[in-house]
């Protein structure tokens, strides 16, 4: 086994893992642009374990620690407004200028008991946080689960990073075990009671669900953790419903404090940085050619050196994962107020969250555009109207997302700036932003051109009515306005004469509007000096010929 080929010194003195899973939220109020899903969680209902977490700025200033201050000043002012809300003076209302990000936490889950493979002893990880991150005006929620344990062999740490964050199995082996998943995962309460157990081995459950719904089914322990949020395709009742929007492997952060991080082999770093299965020291998870540029593309080695042992820290990032490896005896790496440990749980967690929030929000908007196109029935006038409203709504949401949430730079601190750029580059958020922007702009341009076309048609119809109405106006004006002297007639007779004139006038105007397109073609032909008289006459007779016209 891989464990037998590992040096006994490769122990992780403190291991910490944060899973961050973006999900798309379904509307709870049809027609409303802004869906405040968190308001449902604010209501005290039976079976709702979530409560809102107030940030450090709303509590007692005496509880405001140096790590909170360091986190705050790391970010640029526009990012601070996103994370913490607008700056305010004493006496200002708390709700005014509040952060557009809302955090909810459940505290009934105290530990995770994991069995990697059948026959292995279970491993119990402490649960630090289970949080949900909501964002104003964006129908995306991020589930964050933070676990930790001390004194863990490196091979097991690699396996936990690789296997733990799986929403459902990718397949099954010959024994019926879920591929690349934990053999068993359990959520435990503070008293040790089992709250939920994974069901990766239930092959028929996943196959039948995918066949019936054309969507994957979540493992039981992850579905439990999200309740009262429920999977949109499931038969389970729930007001807040979600859909998978990214890969079933949850983005992951890892913190590994080693006795001597310099003893890790190149294969160890590749397995950690690319989050692959555990292996031997000598073996690489991929071919030499495939990982030839690993250090250049996936490592941030600002403080990784033989000469600077106290600050020997290496960061690994592939977009899907952000891993920090350092010395367990280095205060710079382990200090809980100012060290890398604090930065990992605060600054780096937030920049990792923002990068994945950007990607999830863009994917959500793109998905909504595709959904609007799929619902469009071009021969149904009501469907066309709904399509136009949906596109304009997504255009407005995208504009608000751009101005409220989208930024290329989060910090001017060199390390935070570099790590965010590395993460965003691997996630491809800049290219995705341009792609979604182009999609929305193309649809918006089409709707604008269609609106101008309809306005031009309306002007044309009014012009036709005015042109042919001018004939009657000239005739009555030439012959005199008072063709019928009825001023002294009885009132009833005058009313009847008025109606006698009104009805055919309205009918004639409506007839001109109905025939306005054909009449405009006749007027255009009439003004064309190149057409012979017979062709112009044929154009006039075409006014009364029936022809099939496409829906516009």
Region roles according to the model:
Residues 344-485:
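Membrane-associated alpha-helical segments
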Residues 1, 53, 79, 127, ...:
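Generic hydrophobic, helix-prone segments enriched in Leu/Val/Ile
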Residues 1-275, 529-552:
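N-terminal pre-transmembrane cytosolic regions of membrane proteins
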Residues 97-108, 279-292, 399-402, 441-444:
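Generic detector of short, locally flexible boundary/turn motifs and exposed helical patches
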Residues 181, 211, 217, 299, ...:
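Generic recognition of cysteine residues
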Residues 119-124, 294-295, 301-304, 385:
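A short linear-motif detector with a strong N-terminal bias
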Residues 256-377:
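N-terminal extramembrane/targeting module of integral membrane proteins
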Residues 2-7, 430-552:
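Hydrophobic alpha-helical transmembrane segments and their immediately adjacent juxtamembrane loops
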């Amino acid at each position: 086994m891989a464990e037998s080929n590992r040096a006994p010194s490769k122990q992780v003195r403190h291991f910490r893992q944060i899973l961050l899973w973006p999900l798309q939220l379904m509307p709870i109020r049809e027609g409303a642009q802004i869906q405040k899903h968190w308001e449902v969680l604010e209501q005290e209902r039976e079976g709702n374990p979530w409560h809102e977490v107030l940030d450090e700025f709303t509590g007692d200033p005496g509880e405001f620690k140096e790590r909170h201050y360091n986190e705050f000043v790391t970010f640029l002012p526009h990012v601070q407004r996103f994370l913490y809300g607008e700056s305010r003076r004493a006496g200002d209302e708390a709700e005014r200028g509040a952060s557009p990000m809302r955090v909810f936490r459940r505290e009934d889950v105290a530990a995770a008991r994991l069995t990697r493979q059948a026959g292995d002893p279970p491993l119990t990880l402490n649960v630090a946080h289970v949080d949900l991150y909501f964002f104003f005006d964006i129908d995306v929620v991020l589930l964050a689960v933070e676990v930790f344990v001390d004194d863990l062999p490196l091979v097991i740490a690699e396996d936990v990073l690789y296997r733990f964050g799986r929403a459902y199995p990718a397949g099954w082996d010959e024994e019926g075990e879920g591929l690349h998943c934990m053999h068993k995962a359990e959520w435990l309460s503070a008293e040790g009671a089992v709250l939920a157990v994974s069901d990766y081995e239930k092959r028929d459950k996943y196959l039948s669900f995918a066949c019936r719904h054309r969507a994957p089914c979540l493992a039981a322990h992850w579905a439990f953790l999200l309740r009262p949020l429920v999977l949109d395709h499931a038969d389970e009742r729930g007001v807040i419903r979600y859909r998978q929007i990214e890969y079933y492997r949850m983005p992951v952060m890892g913190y590994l404090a080693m006795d001597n991080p310099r003893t890790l082999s190149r294969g160890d770093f590749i397995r950690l940085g690319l989050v692959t299965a555990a292996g031997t020291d000598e073996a690489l998870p991929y071919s030499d050619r495939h990982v030839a540029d690993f250090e250049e593309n996936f490592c941030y080695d600002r403080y990784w050196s033989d000469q600077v042992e106290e600050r020997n820290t290496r960061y690994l990032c592939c977009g899907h994962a952000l891993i920090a490896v350092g010395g367990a005896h280095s205060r710079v790496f382990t200090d809980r107020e100012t060290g890398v440990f604090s930065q990992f749980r605060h600054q780096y967690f937030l920049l990792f969250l923002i990068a994945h929030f950007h990607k999830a929000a863009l994917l959500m908007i793109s998905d909504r555009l595709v959904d609007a196109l799929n619902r469009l029935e071009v021969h149904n006038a009501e469907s066309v109207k709904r399509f136009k409203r949906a596109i304009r709504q997504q255009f407005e949401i995208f504009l608000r997302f751009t101005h409220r949430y989208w930024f290329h730079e989060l910090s001017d601190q060199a390390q935070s700036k570099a790590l965010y750029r590395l993460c965003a580059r691997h996630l491809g958020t800049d290219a995705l932003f341009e792609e979604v922007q182009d999609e929305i702009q193309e649809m918006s341009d089409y709707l604008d051109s269609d609106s101008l076309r309809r306005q031009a048609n309306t002007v044309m119809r009014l012009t036709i009515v005015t042109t042919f109405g001018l004939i009657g106006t000239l005739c009555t004006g030439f012959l005199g306005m008072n063709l019928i002297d009825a001023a002294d007639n009885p009132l009833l007779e005058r009313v009847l004469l008025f109606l006698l004139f009104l009805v055919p006038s309205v009918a004639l105007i409506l007839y001109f509007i109905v025939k306005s397109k054909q009449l405009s073609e006749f007027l255009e032909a009439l003004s064309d000096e190149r057409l012979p008289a017979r062709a112009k006459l044929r154009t006039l007779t075409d006014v009364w010929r029936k022809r099939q016209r496409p829906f516009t």
